[in-house]
């Protein structure tokens, strides 16, 4: 539960689960596993994203955020491919923002909004 979690961990779980639920509600082709089931390297990377997104250097637009997301995934060894494959680290959204479909752009906008909510309302 949140009692033993750091501020960044609480914010990360809120943003991640909010984005996951939004993807599910939109019938997105990729709905992430729950936070509790994600692998440790992913969680560590996501904590860094949330730390940045809740700080002064945050991405303020979905396009800027998508670029940061792509960089983080490439650093974790992911590649572009037409079909999502978590085991082989292949993701169809590893393309420039302009090449994303509307659903993926909307998901990025929701993520930016969730980060802003977490930044302003989840406090110590």
What are the residue ranges of the model-derived segments?
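Alpha-helical propensity feature that highlights long, continuous alpha-helices across diverse contexts
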Residues: 1-124
